[in-house]
Amino acid sequence: MNTEIHLFRQARETRDLAVGESLFQVGDPGETMFAVLEGSVELRRDGQCVETVQTGGIIGELVLIEPAPRSLDAVAVEPSRVAIVNEREFVFLVQEHPTFALKVMRIMAERIRRNSGTPRQA
């Protein structure tokens, strides 16, 4: 996703996170996704890291496809800045940059595969 980070650099809304600061927690309502502009954010389940998302990565994209409460905790592991992307902005990006949509789908598929224990097909 690093090649698309330029799409988020001019985001209308950003948030700075200190080390250990929570971006969201399990059960929080999910209405936005985030793009990591700087730093690293861990995705955790029951306090255990399931993925570290670094500069250029995205977090929380699933709620823009299927609205639901957050299923993981997201915590900054170094000083970080994230772009906040709402549904309207997400739809615009998908329509204007079809390769962005494909990359989001690949990220989602990889996360689903990793969490289900399904091996990757060749």
Predicted features by range, described:
Residues 1-122:
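Cytosolic regulatory regions built on CNB/CRP/Popeye-like sensor folds
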